[in-house]
């Protein structure tokens, strides 16, 4: 018995709890299993009996510390004697909340030196009161980072939890999440240890000293996958689902978890459409359609971590590879958006098979070479506008009948009307709604993205600054007045004049203000490629004249002739266009001039300023401005760091564009005088 305990402790210290729960431990050449996963309907009876033998238990006021023997944890949940979750319970009636007191307790009174709080020894640590719940996967003193585990208000109205007529707002935690089957599902299908391989591309030993973070689902991620699986089990094959999740939702992980779980789904009854048998899986393959190379590798790494045979996964970069993967019955096939036409044709030719088509409509097709390939195949130029992936997919679907042997799952943050009508749920009044919603407002309020409209102003709005300064004498200094004269008294009708305003602001208010620990960058958005080229020349000329220590880059597709001279992105930047995003990461490159390319699907957390001289409306306006919303905690990035100066559009049109995706947005019509001093 002591040998067993010793080996368990050694494996926990070396590999962590997730590994121990998912793998055998070996004691004197005898293999022991410490947890049996939840079976599917297709599993043997013996597997179901083993799962039933798992012992889940709860203790109250659990002592745990050799350092502070009197310390107690309010609640600990175990499986087969291994702690899974700790919970600190707070009561607002005694003026204690989870958001403050619960988190403070973990940060200040729970030492990571105590075994139960060693990183990787538990799956998550919860701070809970009757209104809200929060969790962390790593107790790390003052650096402990908590995330909300809340449902969000109805209809995307923001963070928190809705009123529960039958009890506490957080009752869902014990009624639905901390239950035997759900906990087992989380252990087997959601929790992962990240060793940093996806980012670095290097293989490392999967031991705790190399572990970077423990991945645990937020509530909306667990909820969307659970609801989708439940609906498919009931209905069967052939439905379309729209998952409208904002940036900051962790969409990549949600998509990955869905792919892994959907291939194991069995029908709940034979009434489920295209069900073959109650113990037979509904889908032959899940096809993930994406253009994000990072997501491609992330899916592969995650599924490998889940213990799935890599022989069941295929990467289809060509039509031939895609055809072979489908014919060979690969369970998970990862392909690109430009292969979507071939997918539609291929699956219609194998009508006896069922497919789950998971579309990552992250609008990332505009961020790289893959975009150019798809645009070429559709005779579309992204720099002529309207070239994001859901428009392309929508066009393809109109040209091809959607196969009834497929279920379609579309993930997007900003669905267009056509996408909503094709994939959404129609209510009794004829309105369409997404199957699942995680709104921009909730993401902002929970701190996962920033509010890009916090400091949005039109050029005309600068006139309001004059009165602000007159009414606030403390700001009426020579520096402010000099800046205002240059900005307000000039009507910038020419590109050169507008470029001077842009560079003046960026250099004085962003670069020399050392925003983001002196890492801040900007994007200039122009109406077309010709304007982009002219802006690039104007900005570069001024930067050279002023001897500024940073460069301006440009991004556009193809070749463009301006004033009799031919230009390409690669020639202007001095390196291949496939390297533009990577080169823009360098400190020396601070401003990126674009027309349409990089307006969607481009994630650069250092972007803090945007200068717009282009008509924007609807979804494209939201997508463009959202280039600034990525958080960067390591750089201290907050909404107040952002600044958008718009020479073309109105505050009213921007509010109208954002309203469908962000309820109750507050949009200031004029910038506050304080921008002169930030």
Please annotate each region the language model reported:
Residues 167, 418-519, 536:
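Interdomain helical connector at the RecA1-RecA2 junction of SF1/SF2 helicase-like NTPases
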Residues 330-361, 365-376, 383-398, 573-581, ...:
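Conserved RecA-like ASCE ATPase "motif II neighborhood" in helicase/translocase motors
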Residues 354, 592-594, 599-623, 642-646:
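A short beta-strand element within the Helicase C-terminal
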Residues 367-452:
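Post-DEXD/H (motif II) to motif III coupling segment of the RecA-like Helicase ATP-binding lobe
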Residues 424, 632-678:
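Long, hydrophobic alpha-helical segments
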Residues 1-285, 294, 298-309, 338, ...:
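ATP-dependent helicase/translocase motor core
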Residues 304-345:
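Inter-Walker segment of RecA-like/P-loop motor cores
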Residues 486-594:
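Conserved C-terminal RecA-like helicase domain
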């Amino acid at each position: 018995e002591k040998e067993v305990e010793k080996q368990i402790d050694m494996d926990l210290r070396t590999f962590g709890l997730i590994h121990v729960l998912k793998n055998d431990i070996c004691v004197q050449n005898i293999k022991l299993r410490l947890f049996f996963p939840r079976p599917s309907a297709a599993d043997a009876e013996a597997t179901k009996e083993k799962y039933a033998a798992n012992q889940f238990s709860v203790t109250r006021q659990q002592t745990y510390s050799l350092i502070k023997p009197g310390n107690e944890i309010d609640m600990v949940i175990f499986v087969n004697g291994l702690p899974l979750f700790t919970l600190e319970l707070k009561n607002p009636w005694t003026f204690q909340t989870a958001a403050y007191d619960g988190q403070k307790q973990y940060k200040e009174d729970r030492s990571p030196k105590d075994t139960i709080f060693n990183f990787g020894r538990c799956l998550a640590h919860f701070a809970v009161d009757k209104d809200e719940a929060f969790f962390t996967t790593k107790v790390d003193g003052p650096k402990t980072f908590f995330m909300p585990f809340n449902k969000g208000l109805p209809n995307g109205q923001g963070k928190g939890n809705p009123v529960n007529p039958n009890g506490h707002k957080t009752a869902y935690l014990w009624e639905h999440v901390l239950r035997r089957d759900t906990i087992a599902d989380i252990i087997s299908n959601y929790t992962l240890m990240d060793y940093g391989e996806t980012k670095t591309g290097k293989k490392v030993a999967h031991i705790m000293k190399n572990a970077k973070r423990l991945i645990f689902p937020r509530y909306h991620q667990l909820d969307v996958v659970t609801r989708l699986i439940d609906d498919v089990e009931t209905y069967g094959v052939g439905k379309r689902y729209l998952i409208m999740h904002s940036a900051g939702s962790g969409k990549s992980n949600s998509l990955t978890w869905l792919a892994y779980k959907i291939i194991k789904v069995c029908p709940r009854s034979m009434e489920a459409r295209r069900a073959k048998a109650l113990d037979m899986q509904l889908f032959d393959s899940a096809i993930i359609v994406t253009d994000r190379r990072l997501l491609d590798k992330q899916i592969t790494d995650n599924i490998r971590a889940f213990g799935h045979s890599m022989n069941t996964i295929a990467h289809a970069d060509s039509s031939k590879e895609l055809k072979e993967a489908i014919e060979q019955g690969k369970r998970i096939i990862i392909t690109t958006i430009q292969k979507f036409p071939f997918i539609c044709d291929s699956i219609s030719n194998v009508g006896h098979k069922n497919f789950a088509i998971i579309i990552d409509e992250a609008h990332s097709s505009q961020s790289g070479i893959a975009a150019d390939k798809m645009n070429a195949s559709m005779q579309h130029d992204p720099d002529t506008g309207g070239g994001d992936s859901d428009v392309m997919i929508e066009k393809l679907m109109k040209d091809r009948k959607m196969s009834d042997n497929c279920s379609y799952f579309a993930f997007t943050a900003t669905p267009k009307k056509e996408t909503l009508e094709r994939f959404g749920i129609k209510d009794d009044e004829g309105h369409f709604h997404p199957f699942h919603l995680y709104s921009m407002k909730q993401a902002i309020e929970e701190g996962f993205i920033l509010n890009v409209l916090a400091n949005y102003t039109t050029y005309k709005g600068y006139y309001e600054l004059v009165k602000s300064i007159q009414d606030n004498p403390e700001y009426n200094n020579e520096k402010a007045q000099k800046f205002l004269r240059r900005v307000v008294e000039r009507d910038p009708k020419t590109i050169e004049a507008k470029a001077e305003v842009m560079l003046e602001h960026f250099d004085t208010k962003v670069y020399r203000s050392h925003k983001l620990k002196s890492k801040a960058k900007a994007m200039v958005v122009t109406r077309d490629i010709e304007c982009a080229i002219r802006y690039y020349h104007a900005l570069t000329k001024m930067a050279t004249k002023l001897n500024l220590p940073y460069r301006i880059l440009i991004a556009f597709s193809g070749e463009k002739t301006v004033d009799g001279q031919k230009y390409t992105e690669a020639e202007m930047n001095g390196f291949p266009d496939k390297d533009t995003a990577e080169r823009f990461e360098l400190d020396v490159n601070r401003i990126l001039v674009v027309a349409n390319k990089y307006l969607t699907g481009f994630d650069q957390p250092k972007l803090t300023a945007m200068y717009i001289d282009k008509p924007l409306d609807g979804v494209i306006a939201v997508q463009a401005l959202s280039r600034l919303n990525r958080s960067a905690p390591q750089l201290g990035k907050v909404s107040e760091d952002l600044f958008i100066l718009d020479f073309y559009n109105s505050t009213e049109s921007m509010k109208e564009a954002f309203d469908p995706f962000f309820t109750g947005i507050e949009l200031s019509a004029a910038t506050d005088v304080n921008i002169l001093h930030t």
